[in-house]
Structures are given as structure tokens and as C-alpha cells.
């Protein structure tokens, strides 16, 4: 069984970092994701050491590995042969600071959304929201520096340039109590005239 503790996304694809928690992992072994229920083939996995990666055919409990092309696996997922095993997840803090992001060029909104979602795969403390009330795209993080780094990565990795601003607040009103209102309308202009009496 393996536990996914990190995901790295760039313009070339996604790399998934994992730790072998129990048993033995062999090349081409098929494991089931306990979160999504999907099966993933562990075709080629490597042991990372700085920028160098060494491919292995077998890994044992305690080994750290990296693999690409896992389609339905994210950080905090557990993969095992039975698919019923789930290891304790890493507790990431909830992001609290938001900035609006606006495309610098026309028609780049879909590209921006797709690129930000790749960043959120990599950093679980980032969050993306397309706010239906304010019609704004919002990116949430733990502070200004993290959000600035995210915007910089959008440009350097995916070629997406955005402008940031303050998010708008969607104000709401609600009915607090029951009231009654009465109104009368009178108009006399020499003819039959007009009269109305309304209660609400």
C-alpha cells in the first residue's frame, strides 16, 4: 500500500510523490484508490534524489517514490490492492485570503481556470472559486506572498498572465419580521374619478 503526500504539476504533466507504507510495490502492479475507487497502474516509478531520479522495479515499505500519469489520484490518497485501506490524511490549513484574477487577454478565462486548478493539485492550501454571485474568479491562499508566487507560476509555467484585485462582496438582505402596510389612492378630475385601497 502507498500514501500520496505530494503532487507536482507543470506544463509537461503531473508527478505524484508517494511513500510505500506496507508490503512490496512492483512494476506494473495495479492498485485501487480508496477515495475515488479507481484503479491505477504503477507502470514506471522512480526514487527521487535532488534533480536525479532512479527507476526501480521493486520498492519496499518505507521507500519514497515518484510516478507520473496517475489520472485520478491526488495528495492525501491511499492506494492499495484491496482499495479498502485509508491512511490518516495530512491536515492542511484552510486558506483565508482571497484575490480576484482577471485575464489580461480576451478569451483566456478557461485557460486561467485550468492552470489554477493544476496549482491547487500541487498546493492544497490554495483554493480556486468561480463566484457566481459576483462573476469573479477568486484564488484563495494563506497570505499575499503565496498568492503572488501562484500568479508568478501561472505566467512562468503555463504562459498565463493575469491581473489581481480585491474581491467584491455579495451583500444579501433577508426578511426579519412580518409587517402590514396599507395605502389608498384617490384621484378626482371631474369625471368618475379613481379610488384604490391596498393592504399588504
PLM feature spans:
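Conserved cytochrome P450 K-helix/beta-meander segment immediately N-terminal to the heme-binding cysteine loop
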Residues: 200
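Charged, conformationally dynamic linker/hinge segments
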Residues: 82-196
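Conserved nucleotide-binding/hydrolysis modules and their immediate coupling elements
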Residues: 1-98, 113, 136
Amino acid at each position: 500500500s502507498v500514501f500520496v503526500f505530494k503532487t507536482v504539476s507543470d506544463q509537461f504533466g503531473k508527478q505524484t510523490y508517494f511513500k510505500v507504507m506496507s508490503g512490496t510495490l512492483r512494476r506494473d502492479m495495479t492498485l485501487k484508490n480508496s477515495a475515488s475507487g479507481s484503479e491505477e497502474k504503477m507502470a514506471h516509478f522512480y526514487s527521487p534524489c535532488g534533480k536525479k531520479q532512479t527507476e526501480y522495479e521493486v520498492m519496499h515499505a518505507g521507500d519514497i517514490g515518484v510516478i507520473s500519469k496517475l489520472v485520478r489520484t491526488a495528495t492525501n490518497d491511499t492506494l492499495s490492492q484491496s482499495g479498502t485501506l485509508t491512511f490518516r490524511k495530512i491536515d492542511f490549513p484552510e486558506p483565508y485570503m482571497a484575490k480576484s484574477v482577471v485575464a489580461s487577454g480576451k478569451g483566456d478565462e478557461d485557460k486561467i481556470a485550468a492552470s489554477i486548478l493544476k496549482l491547487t493539485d500541487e498546493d492544497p492550501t490554495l483554493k480556486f472559486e468561480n463566484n457566481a454571485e459576483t462573476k469573479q474568479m477568486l484564488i484563495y491562499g494563506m497570505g499575499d506572498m503565496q498568492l503572488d508566487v501562484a500568479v508568478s507560476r501561472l505566467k512562468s509555467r503555463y504562459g498565463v498572465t493575469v491581473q489581481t484585485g480585491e474581491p467584491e462582496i455579495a451583500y444579501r438582505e433577508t426578511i426579519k419580521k412580518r409587517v402590514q402596510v396599507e395605502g389608498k389612492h384617490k384621484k378626482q378630475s371631474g369625471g368618475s374619478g379613481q379610488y384604490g385601497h391596498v393592504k399588504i
